From Swiss-Prot:
It comes from the Bacteria. The gene is prfC. This is Peptide chain release factor 3. Gene3D superfamilies: P-loop containing nucleotide triphosphate hydrolases, Peptide chain release factor 3, domain III. Keywords: Cytoplasm, GTP-binding, Nucleotide-binding, Protein biosynthesis. Residues 9-277 form the tr-type G domain. The keyword ATP-binding does not apply.
Length: 526
């Protein structure tokens, strides 16, 4: 077995998806604790203690206690090497989140057991459906009062259209939370509160019929036996093939804050989640065990190092292996580049990568030449597909307090749009600059970063734009006519792609009827 194959088989690359405040960043902390990457998990928003969550590292994130930028963390667990991509969890950081989901092989969905399925979770699940990504589910916050577990699973099945197979089952909740029963292992793991910061030995009782269980939890033992009869009859058994197709999700219960149940999830991911998968390109399917290196960029992050105004492109390795100093072919611009200083990450702490395998994420220093979606190979000319731009849902006009800095403003906006922080549109008929985002917080981030990184003071004004669509037409003559007649609604985006800026949905629908040969697209491949 080649070194490459051994390394590929070890890798598990996943992201965590959840609604804001369901406990995603806490789980990230605890997962790293189990991977020995952190000795003491700093509870998130732990402002009093001055210990900030490891994965929230940009200034604004430190101020607000939210993870704005996707961080990457690699750690060993149970004989595997796990790559965890932390995704922005707050209301508004969705486009980055969407794109991160294109770089993973499986996802962990975290649900607040008091609330059930919430709208951001629904949106993110739609994105995972584009590639039928396998999903593992964690019902969190069992140390609080929760909804009925069977009802929670029914809701996941109905709303997200995925079958649920319980792997662990809760015994009580809130102040009466006693632990979980691991259905596949036939063992009860008992919970003790106040042990969230470190990994402690838990008491395990083997066998649901063990009299020790009655001694330990009293009448809860008999209740559990009755409940399990019902659960076994009413729920799906775990089916590995259905899981790999994205049709069924194994469900775990626990509390991330109490560091309870997190090891069960990790065991499940290592045992069941797929190793790095083949990837589609516009030429052929790329297999992870191919000899030659390939990879694609799914995110660009500015300012990872406050001492340098650098930008780092995050690349998923898809085949072959990266070695320090190797030559890569940057397909879009047709140039070869020598890469001697790629990085591996532990959220803001960076180390030089000497070698990286399929499933790993490496960072390339970017001086403005790399864009989201770029493919790198060892000479072959093809492009990985499936890293889209999503049409913004909110728009603002942006203008300067000091008109002499127009050049810096445009430079800053184009760089921020290449990085995916925001989208920028330049209308054909005016000198306006329009900024588009998927959520309000992105606008704040952009103004803050323009000031700190480009020394530009910008302000927003309202603008009557409802939505945007990228426009295409195979017939050049028809496209030119459309351009002439609709120029007041057309703009170029940060990559100079023609975009229709619609003041209302009615206007968009009328234009689509009037120009049937023009394609109005909601997403655009990079």
């Amino acid at each position: 077995m080649s070194d490459n194959k051994v390394e590929v088989d070890k890798r598990r690359t996943f992201a965590i998806i959840s609604h804001p405040d369901a406990g995603k960043t806490t789980i990230t902390e605890k997962v790293l604790l189990f991977g020995n990457a952190l000795q003491k998990a700093g509870t998130v928003k732990g402002k009093k203690s001055g210990q900030h969550a490891k994965s929230d590292w940009m200034e604004m994130e430190k101020d607000r206690g939210i993870s704005i930028t996707t961080s990457v963390m690699q750690f060993p667990y149970g004989g595997a090497l796990v790559n965890l991509l932390d995704t922005p969890g707050h209301e508004d950081f969705s486009e980055d989140t969407y794109r991160t989901l294109t770089a993973v092989d499986s996802c962990l969905m975290v649900i607040d057991s008091a609330k059930g399925v919430e709208d951001r979770t629904i949106k993110l699940m739609e994105v995972t459906r584009l590639r039928d990504t396998p999903i593992v589910t964690f019902m969190n916050k069992l140390d609080r009062d929760i909804r009925d577990p069977i009802e929670l699973m029914d809701e996941v099945e109905d709303v997200l259209n995925i079958a649920c197979a319980p792997i662990t089952w809760p015994i009580g909740s809130g102040k009466e939370f006693k632990g979980v029963y691991h259905i596949l292992r036939d063992e009860v793991v008992l919970y003790q509160s106040g042990m969230g910061h470190t990994i402690q030995e838990r008491r395990v009782i083997e066998g649901i019929d063990n009299p020790e269980l009655d001694k330990a939890i009293g009448s809860y033992a008999a209740d559990l036996r009755d409940e399990m009869e019902l659960v076994r009859g009413a729920s799906n058994e775990f089916d590995h093939q259905a899981f790999l197709k994205g049709e069924l999700t194994p469900v775990f219960f626990g509390t991330a804050l109490g560091n309870f149940g997190v090891d069960h999830i990790l065991d499940g991911i290592v045992e069941w989640a797929p190793k790095p998968l083949p990837r589609e390109s516009d030429a052929r399917m790329i297999m992870p065990d191919e000899e030659k290196f390939t990879g694609f960029v799914f995110k660009i992050q500015a300012n990872m190092d406050p001492k340098h105004r650098d930008r780092v492109a995050f690349m998923r390795v898809c085949s072959g292996r990266y070695e320090q100093g190797m030559k890569m072919h940057h397909v879009r611009i047709g140039k070869d580049v020598n890469v001697s200083d790629a990085l591996t990450f532990m959220a803001g702490d960076r180390e030089r990568a000497e070698v990286a395998y399929p499933g790993d994420i490496i960072g390339l220093h970017n001086h403005g030449t790399i864009r989201i979606g770029d493919t790198f190979t060892q000479g072959e000319k093809f492009r990985f597909t499936g890293v889209p731009n999503f049409a913004p849902e909110m728009f603002r006009r942006i203008r300067l307090r000091d008109p002499l800095k127009q050049k810096q403003l445009l430079k800053g906006l184009v760089q921020l749009s290449e990085e995916g922080a925001v989208q920028v549109f330049r209308p054909l008929d005016t000198n306006d600059l329009i900024v588009g985002a998927v959520g309000v917080l992105q606008f704040e981030v952009v103004v803050g970063r323009l000031k700190s990184e480009y020394n530009v003071e910008a302000i927003y004004e309202g603008i009557s734009v409802s939505t945007a669509r990228w426009v295409y037409c195979k017939d050049e003559r028809k496209l030119e006519e459309f351009r002439r007649k609709c120029s007041q609604n057309l703009a170029l985006d940060g990559g100079d792609n023609l975009t229709y800026i619609a003041p209302t949905m009615v206007n968009l629908n009328l234009s689509m009827e009037r120009y049937p040969d023009i394609e109005f697209a909601k997403t655009r491949e990079h």
